[in-house]
A protein has these predicted regions:
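Residue-level recognition of phosphate/Mg2+-coordinating polar/acidic sites
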Residues: 107-112, 129, 134-138, 142-153, ...
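Glycine-rich FAD pyrophosphate-binding loop
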Residues: 55, 71-96
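Beta1/beta-strand and adjacent pyrophosphate-binding region of the FAD-binding site
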Residues: 44-62, 80
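A conserved short coil-to-beta-strand element within the FAD-binding core of flavoproteins
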Residues: 182-197
């Protein structure tokens, strides 16, 4: 059945008509026949005397999860998801197509919040206490999805397929009667005198606009311009968005020959000129991968997230300092090199090197090349000063960062609606009643490892809970009012 929106203004018009509506938008007049939202699901029978409408902008993780939660609490609430592309598109490609649902090692709120470069202070309150990683894993398990936690804490479906997560969410939203409208985009939003929202919804083909009055509006459109524009129209400010979670381009032609080498544990430090404050998180320890253009891997991605804003101001220029033997003191590195020299004095330096460092031959030759020690040089001819230089190179190898490259498994942005303008215990706007936000449209971003999806699940759940409770309360008030009449 189609959603009953008889008391809402919903009309089709060409986009140019938007500018002529002015403030008289409580009910738009059209010469065309009024049209209702069509539903791709089959909603439960509605209580037409107390119908209210929730429009969710964006059918990503936060939007779908929030819609499900709201509809679960308030079955009589009409819930419509508006998505300009495919629903749950980022879920499909994340984690190499496996979907990194959350992180199972950081379940305590204080520890969990520290994984959010933007939000680590604000999220230490009720946000994750209301719906954290354990709650997320329980929800999916209760809905038939088997999950597994890998050694690094990342949680994936046992199927190793993001389709399992997508099918679960879409099946539940359909079962509840959530309507999904694709190939449409909400392009205008304004409050009405009656406390509702007049939304202009552009259809992708042909180019025309529908208008609808919504009782509740949840903006969960990710890091695209659409959500920022709607938030601005409704009185919110926007922190300028910049990329987060990216790899480093390095100015070193010889590094390309090392592409594919992985270092299991490296201490990586990012130095940025004229940085006015100390950022402890600009030093990270973890795996590092050499790419054709520079460096990637978990340690690099964490650096990029914590340095996202300052790097954007420098044009993504800085110095990357890598310690390839983080568990070995510099004096011990010197000692190991000296012992190796004494033991293998007659062997070529390029062919023989200490196994204690866990290095591969290609990288060892790279280190020697930077010290000018390649060729037929024997260990016996290596001076003490040269050994010290090699030791320092292993512990303090600097690279010039000249730019960034997108990390294809993540599409994360720092910036968005400031958290100071949102009540995090409800996700409701402090500026506009009945307006809610969830997900990456907010100025929240996490490091790699399932943290960005957890932000989406938590925010969507809290927003959906708040909307559902308000809708139920409104229905009870209306029922009581009718009873008194």
């Amino acid at each position: 059945m189609s959603l009953s929106l008889a008391r809402f203004a919903l009309h089709s018009r060409v986009f140019s008509d938007v500018a002529t509506t002015g403030n008289s938008n409580r009910r738009l007049i059209s010469t065309r026949k009024n049209r209702k939202f069509s539903s791709t699901a089959s909603p439960r029978a509605q209580n037409k005397g107390s119908e209210e409408l929730l429009v969710v902008v964006g059918a990503g993780a936060a939007g779908v999860y929030g819609a499900i939660r709201a509809k679960t609490l308030a079955p009589n609430l009409n819930v419509v998801l508006i998505e300009k592309a495919r629903p749950l598109a980022k879920v499909k490609v994340s984690g190499g197509g496996r979907c990194n649902v959350t992180n199972g090692h950081c379940v305590e709120t204080m520890m969990l919040a520290e994984n959010y470069p933007r939000g680590h202070k604000e999220l230490k309150g009720a946000f994750f206490n209301t719906h954290g990683p354990v709650d997320t894993m329980t929800w999916f398990s209760d809905h038939g999805v088997e999950l597994k936690t890998e050694d690094d804490g990342r949680v994936f479906p046992v199927s190793n397929s993001s389709s399992t997560i997508i099918d679960c969410l879409m099946s539940e939203s359909t079962r509840l009667g959530v309507s999904l409208q694709t190939r449409k985009a909400v392009i205008t939003a304004s409050p009405t005198d009656g406390g509702k929202f007049l939304l202009g919804i552009e259809k992708r083909t042909p180019s025309s606009v529908e208008y609808v009055e919504a009782d509740y509006l949840l903006i969960a459109s990710g890091n695209g311009k659409q959500g920022y524009s709607l938030a601005s129209q409704l009185g919110h400010s926007i922190v300028d968005p910049v990329p987060s979670l990216f790899t480093f381009k390095i100015e070193d032609p010889q590094l390309a020959d090392l592409s594919g080498i992985t270092f299991p544990k490296v201490k990586a430090k990012l130095k940025i000129e004229n940085l006015q404050r100390n950022i402890p998180q600009l030093t990270q320890v973890g795996p590092v991968l050499v790419t054709h253009w520079g460096f990637s891997g978990p340690a690099i991605l964490r650096l990029s997230a914590w340095g996202a804003c300052v790097l954007s101001r420098t044009g993504y220029k800085g110095t990357l300092i890598l310690d390839f033997t983080p568990d070995v003191h510099i004096e011990d590195v010197k000692s190991i090199l000296t012992q190796h020299k004494n033991k293998f004095a007659k062997q070529k330096v390029a062919n023989s090197y200490p196994t204690e460092f866990g290095l591969v031959k290609r990288f060892w030759k790279y280190i020697l090349g930077r010290q000018g020690l390649l060729g037929d040089i024997l260990w016996a001819s290596i001076s003490k000063d040269s050994l010290v230089s090699v030791a320092h190179m292993l512990k303090h190898c600097d690279f010039s960062v000249k730019g960034k490259s997108q990390y294809k498994d993540e599409f994360v942005t720092a910036g968005g609606v400031p958290l100071s303008e949102i009540s995090l215990n409800t996700m409701e706007s402090k500026i506009q009643p009945r307006l809610f936000f969830a997900g990456e449209v907010l100025n929240v971003d996490g490091i790699t490892g399932g943290f960005n999806f957890q932000n989406a699940w938590s925010g969507g759940y809290i927003a959906g809970t708040s909307i559902g409770n308000q809708a139920v309360s409104a229905q009870l008030d209306e029922a009581n009012s009718r009873g008194q009449d």
